[in-house]
A protein has these predicted regions:
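N-terminal hydrophobic targeting/anchoring segments and the immediately downstream early-domain regions
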Residues: 2-24, 141-155, 162
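Histidine/acidic residue-rich metal-binding segments in metalloenzymes
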Residues: 13-120, 124-140
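Active-site proximal loops enriched in glycine and acidic residues that flank catalytic Cys/His/Asp
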Residues: 67, 91, 119, 296-298, ...
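Active-site-proximal loop/turn and secondary-structure-junction residues that shape catalytic pockets
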Residues: 67-71, 91-93, 121-122, 169, ...
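Short linear, low-complexity motifs centered on an aromatic residue
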Residues: 96-112, 131, 229, 236-238, ...
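Glycine-rich, acidic/polar active-site loops that bind/position phosphate-bearing ligands
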Residues: 143-328, 337-340, 347-590
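Composition- and surface-driven signal marking solvent-exposed, interaction-prone regions
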Residues: 232, 308, 330-331, 357-361, ...
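C-terminal amphipathic alpha-helical interaction region
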Residues: 525-729
Length: 729
């Protein structure tokens, strides 16, 4: 194995950047060329078929079988112009990845000749095996049927020689088995609820859209080094490795010069993204060595989520071409920053109003304040649901580690905006307001845009921060499907807005004027949600104590965090807003707990294998060298001098012996703990057992191995070290 390490380093020394040729100097010449967007639809579809698609997207009008056949034929003609040979229903099962089965267009004609055909039936629906994907017990092998159904709101696209059709994935009995189905439901729920509230201010608003801008962080490592690290290959993270003498302490990597090989990779990635209509705009070095970020312009949340899933797949494929491996794990290296995926979330009306941006007049600012205050209450009431949506084995290594937001949910608004809310709460009277009081309030509200101009500072320790015209949810992990967080946020927002509107209508029924009713409910909501507002250092120990006194929860135990999906509040949101039914919600919880269990189980097995088969033998080899050295010293030096000269080597032999013994003993204990957990029939008990009795061994065994790495001859150490993984360019 040590030979493989040095071969990898030698191979890396000979790497050169690949030449990447841009299709055209003009981005617009090839942007969206591989997407069946409206421009291509207009060219390849008859007018009536094009109208059927646009009506389905904008109004939800069903597409007839006749129109589906016309659309499928036009889609096939467009795809053939790009040399496509196969098509697939592209969907997002509960695996944090995507799935696809490629079928050719080949069919037999009536006379037995081979023809190429793509019908509306094949476009609209297919039947993959639902039992082979995570399903929480909904589907068994003997009842395996599931359906994929075309999501007309997300355009088809071509990757290499395959036409990919975005679809939802449901069981034969109708339960959702993917991320897209509940995401579409959550977006529809917040659309309706937000539109109803908007119409209290502006009857011209008939729809509200959810926008998402994700920021994808990732690490790159040379493929030769990656292949020499079995833990990276099998788990996505290093299960052992002593910190490099230099890591990120000089803060010289963030926004630094991008290495040429990485630039070539980024350039090709951007070209492929632009062909697929993914509006990537920003690329830069991140804080940790060999860590980078890619970010697009925001889009409709459903399309943005599809694009993020596609980007993660593109990254892996293009990285291989450039002799890299892309690491999307939240914490691939201990001791340096991990990777997240910030979700920039906003709501926008069909009249062009960003509901999280101050308006141009008091009326517009009232609308802004209404939605701002409802976000505060939404997060306060649903902190456990939001945490559950981002809880995972990988993300738990990152959250609360002085590099990412803590597991405590709070909102940062900035002092100026917080003081405005406090002033509104102070000025609004509990009794009937006078005309003068209303005027004073409206004048103060009218000043919001000038107050907020360049005053919304950035608090990097806040998990849910207002950044001027959007909220940035920073707790999501880099490998996660954005849909999980977007489902929770939008469903919770829909529920909160519905409650807000009901409260206002109740006051209006009692004879209170609309404006005054809005002011009163805003005051109540501002006061009730005050504990969720925090402007300070989210990393500090003082905040943990203060958060507890405010009634905010701090759950770092992953299975416990996931169990909050079944709390009354989470159920009232997810089931009450019809995002999930009882069966689907129970299925989600089971899948997430099983996923957590399997990831810890794999890490445990890999660590045990590497420890016993690679590290311990290396330690024994070096120990034998030391013993041979002692024998040589005894032969040369007189006893008294020998004792002095050999003392340090004896101590090192003793140290290595103790650590080898500890490693073997703890691997044995970890294996026994795993066996006990594996015999548990209840998936909840199993997840808790892995968290509490198996996972602690990962750190304790690692500590011994990392110390051995610093004691054993570098020439025989079997695995690439952190300095090589992080600093070889």
């Amino acid at each position: 194995m040590s030979k493989m390490r040095f071969f990898a380093l030698q191979e890396l020394a000979n790497r050169r950047p690949l030449e990447v040729i841009t299709p055209s100097n003009k981005l617009s010449d090839y942007y969206g060329s591989h997407v069946f967007d409206r421009k291509n639809m207009q060219e390849y579809l008859p007018k009536e078929a094009y109208k059927a698609v646009t009506d389905a997207i904008e109004k939800g009008t069903p597409i007839s079988r006749e129109m589906a056949d016309l659309i499928a034929n036009g889609m096939k003609s467009w795809a053939k112009s790009l040399n496509v040979t196969h098509y697939t229903h592209w969907f997002q099962p509960l695996t944090d990845g995507t799935a696809e089965k490629h079928d050719g267009f080949i069919e037999f004609g009536e006379d037995g000749d081979v023809i190429e055909r793509f019908s509306g039936k094949l476009l609209i629906q297919q039947e993959p095996d639902a039992s082979s994907f995570p399903n929480g017990g909904i589907r068994n092998t003997f009842e395996a049927r599931g359906y994929t159904a075309w999501d007309v709101s997300s355009p088809a696209f071509v990757v290499e020689t395959t036409l990919c059709i975005p679809t939802i994935f449901i069981s034969y009995t109708g339960e959702a088995l993917d991320y897209k189905t509940p995401l579409l439901k959550a977006l529809a729920a917040v659309d309706k609820a937000a539109t109803d509230v908007c119409q209290l201010f502006d009857k011209n608003i008939t729809r509200v859209y959810t926008n998402l801008g994700w920021e994808q962080e990732y690490f790159l490592v040379d493929s030769a080094l990656y292949n020499a690290r079995p833990d990276l290959c099998l788990t996505g993270r290093t299960l052992m490795g002593h910190s490099s003498a230099k890591d990120q302490q000089l803060e010289d990597h963030y926004f630094g010069s991008i290495p040429p090989r990485v630039t070539a990779f980024m350039k090709e990635l951007e070209i492929e993204c632009h062909k697929l209509g993914i509006p990537v705009k920003t690329r830069h070095n991140e804080v940790a060595p060999n860590q980078f970020e890619l970010a697009p312009i925001f889009e409709n949340a459903n399309l943005a989520n599809d694009h993020n899933q596609l980007v993660m797949d593109l990254m892996k494929r293009i990285a291989r071409k450039h002799n890299f491996a892309v690491l999307l794990h939240e914490k691939p290296y201990s001791g340096v920053n991990g990777s997240g995926k910030h979700n920039n979330w906003s709501l926008c009306t069909d009249t062009g109003i960003n509901l999280f941006a101050p308006g141009k007049n008091p009326k517009g600012n009232m609308l802004f304040l209404t939605f701002l205050v409802n976000v505060l209450m939404m997060v306060y009431k649903n902190q456990d649901l939001l945490r559950a949506s981002i809880a995972s084995a990988g993300n738990s290594y990152r959250l609360g580690a002085n590099e990412a937001p803590p597991a405590i949910l709070s909102i940062f608004l900035g002092k100026q905006l917080s003081s405005i809310l406090d002033e509104i709460a102070r000025q609004v009277s509990n009794s009937k307001m006078t005309a003068e009081e209303k005027t004073t309030l409206k004048l103060g509200i009218g000043r919001i845009p000038e107050i907020l101009l360049d005053t919304t500072d950035r608090n990097r320790t806040s998990p849910f921060a207002f950044t001027g015209n959007r909220f940035e949810f920073r707790a999501a992990g880099s490998s996660a499907n954005c849909a999980a967080a977007m489902i929770a946020i939008n469903a919770a927002m829909a529920s909160q807005l519905n409650e807000f509107k009901i409260s206002i209508e109740k006051l209006m029924e009692e004879g209170v004027g609309k404006d005054e009713a809005i002011f009163r409910i805003l005051k109540e909501t501002i006061i009730a949600s005050e504990p969720i507002r925090f402007e300070g250092d989210g990393y500090s120990e003082q905040w943990k104590q203060e958060a507890a006194s405010r009634g905010l929860t701090n759950i770092c135990h992953v299975p416990q965090a996931l169990m909050r999906y079944m709390d009354n509040q989470a159920r009232s949101v997810l089931i009450g807003e019809r995002i999930f039914n009882e069966t689907e919600l129970a299925c989600r919880l089971e899948v997430e707990l099983e996923k957590y269990t399997m990831k810890v189980q794999i890490e445990s097995r890999v660590l045990g294998d590497l420890a016993i088969n690679h590290i311990v033998p290396t330690a024994v080899i070096y120990q034998n060298r030391l013993l041979e050295n002692l024998r040589g010293l005894r032969e040369i030096f007189p006893p008294e001098e020998y004792e002095v000269l050999s003392a340090d080597r004896k101590e090192l032999i003793r140290e290595i012996s103790h650590r080898v013994t500890a490693i073997k003993m703890q691997v044995r204990e970890m294996t026994e703990a795993r066996k006990v957990a594996n015999h548990m029939n209840n998936y909840k008990d199993k997840a808790f057992a892995y968290e509490e009795t198996v996972r602690p061994y990962l750190e304790s065994i690692r500590e011994h191995i990392d110390n051995l790495e610093m004691e054993i001859d570098d020439e025989i150490w079997p695995l690439p070290k952190y300095r090589e993984l992080l600093f070889t360019k």
